[in-house]
């Protein structure tokens, strides 16, 4: 048991006396973030509703994100806000953070691109399930809901099976 818990302390808050003097430093400009979210939303929805339209346009988004991250100052400190987001905002944020980490690890451009593509597609199967998953704790879900949620990985894989442009 960690020392803090043994003292009966359940949570800790750190006050930053300089917080009011700092400006938020997002990974990318909020307008660019919103543009990415809208592109991801449009692509995922058109794939669902238009008989399997190719997801190849994710290549362009992946390249744009890698380019935007590469253009950032190298030693920038990024603020990450806790917030509720939808599937599309989550997808873009995971992609941005992952490419940022890949850059810090000095991975080559091809690996950063593959990471971006994987992140953009990592939850595509959630578009095919019928159970509610947003803001949900599945530790107390009934077996049928848990089974339905877990299907998103298989459904996502199946949705990508015909996409020949994705690296093996």
What are these regions (language model features)?
Residues 17-150, 154-164, 168:
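Acidic/His-rich, divalent-metal-binding segments that scaffold phosphate/diphosphate chemistry
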């Amino acid at each position: 048991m960690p020392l803090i818990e043994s003292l009966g302390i359940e949570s800790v808050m750190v006050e930053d006396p300089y917080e009011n003097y700092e400006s938020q430093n997002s990974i990318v400009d909020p307008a660019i973030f919103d543009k990415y979210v809208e592109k991801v939303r449009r692509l995922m929805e058109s794939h669902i509703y238009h008989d399997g339209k190719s997801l190849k346009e994710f290549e362009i988004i992946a390249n744009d994100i890698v380019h935007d991250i590469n253009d950032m100052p190298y030693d920038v400190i990024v603020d990450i806000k806790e917030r509720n987001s939808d599937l599309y905002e989550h997808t873009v944020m995971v992609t941005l953070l992952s490419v940022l980490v890949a850059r810090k690890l000095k991975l080559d451009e091809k690996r950063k691109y593959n990471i971006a593509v994987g992140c953009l597609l990592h939850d595509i199967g959630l578009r095919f399930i019928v159970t509610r998953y947003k803001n949900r704790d599945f530790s107390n879900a009934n077996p049928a809901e848990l089974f339905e949620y877990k299907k998103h990985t298989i459904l996502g894989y199946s949705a990508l099976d015909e996409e020949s442009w994705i690296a093996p």
